[in-house]
Amino acid sequence: MSDYQAILPLALIGLFILSQVLYLLASAVDFYLYSLPVNWVDMSEVGLLGPGDHPYIVLFYPVLNELEETMRTTLTSLGALDYPRDRYRVVAIPNAGDTDTVASLERLQREFPFLQLMPVPPTSDASWQVVWDAWNGNDKAYWWHRGRRANIRDLPPKKTRQLIYAFYTTVAEFAGREDFLIDYIDADSCPPSDHLLAAAVGIRHYDVLQTQNIAGNLNHTMAASWHAFDHMAWDGLKYPHLSANGRQPYWVLGKGTFFRASDLVTLGGFHPWLTIEDPEVGMRFWVNGRRLGIIENPLIEEVPSTLMKGITQRKRWVAGFFQSLNSPLREMGMSRWQRFKAWLIFLPCLSLSVNALGIPIGVWAMWTWLDDTSILPLWTVGLAAFNVATYAATLLVMYRSTWKRSALVLGSRRARLWYLLRVNPVFLSIWWLVWLVPLWIGYRMYVHDRGLVWERTEKINANEPLMQQLVR
């Protein structure tokens, strides 16, 4: 017998055991997250709001090279908001150099008189001084005071820069007046009519509010179905448990997020040097004692209709996750245990990489077991059986939640069944293998310090028919 023939069985057994242990650890993380309590915003309290109980809300709408039709669909939903008209404003914040989008928004202002426009100038403009002054006096803006990009004013041209300018400019306008809430959404985000009312209720109990999300075009293409399931499994099922009575670090989702303006000023605003701002700002709020509340009635958004566009979106998420979980955690003052708990948020996504090993070695193990030529110790088969049972139970929970939530955007049982068919366990296994691509690209973006330019997720106004039905 050659050395190769002697070593191969041991190597296969070792790889099988490794994959099963990793799956077991991933299941343990899931169990921990699902065991955490959820702090829901109680919408039954809306009726208790008096005339003075509606905080002023500024809703920022950052856009970049967007279709006018997509923005019209979003603005149609914003026009149906149920909130005192003198207690909120909607402010579109395109880059000043994005002349096509600015022109589209100016045309849309004729249809939607509530829409205000704040073009964001280059950082060389004198109006940015309000930002530099705020950061100079606030050590919580650690990126401005320490590190290789300290005091660099040439901020990367992406959504975060637009939010930074709009936020501090608005704070300066409100100086000496009442505190207010800020909310921001994406170009395609269509909030429900009670979106702002939920904020008025929730902010009485919590410091940060996060609205859940759901895809409206989930049956548009197979790729859209798979992309939408990410939101079903994360935004709609697992994410709410991060509220956890303040026990667990949390991220925010980057749309439908409410902060008190005074809190965001105190804690330094948004970090401009990360691919996405959502994870870092949420964890900075958590480590400074701000509690999270979850708004159940979701924003309706559009997911990419092709795999390549979905990979582009997800590689940016992954890069931002790695960036946010590195030096920022120490800069914001997290202990080692707190940093460990922060990493647990990313592990369910990162554990998808185990499939690169687990699926092929699992196929081999199953084949040899059925062929009665298995060389695996009996206890490893028991471990695998436990993992399979845990996986089946997890899928059952996901499908039950998906069936319930899909009713929000699909009008018939047939359409909902069709969606469940498109995300069956076999197809999900394929999709989770595809996830290896953005995981790898996103990791390389993190290692090489890329992702500072906004790679827009292209929207095609896929939700217009749905929103025409819902907004009447």
Describe each model-derived feature in a short phrase.
Residues 25-56, 330-342, 371-472:
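Juxtamembrane C-terminal module of membrane proteins
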Residues 175-190:
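Short beta-strand-to-loop acidic/aromatic patch adjacent to the donor-nucleotide binding site
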Residues 1-76:
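N-proximal low-complexity "stem/linker" segments adjacent to membrane-targeting elements
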Residues 94-110, 121-129:
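A conserved acidic beta->alpha catalytic loop
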Residues 56-58, 89, 280:
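Cell-envelope/extracellular polymer assembly enzymes that use nucleotide-activated donors
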Residues 75-87, 111:
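Short, acidic, metal-binding catalytic loop of nucleotide-sugar glycosyltransferases
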Residues 118-119, 126-176, 193-274, 311, ...:
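Long helical/loop segments within the catalytic core of UDP-sugar-dependent glycosyltransferases
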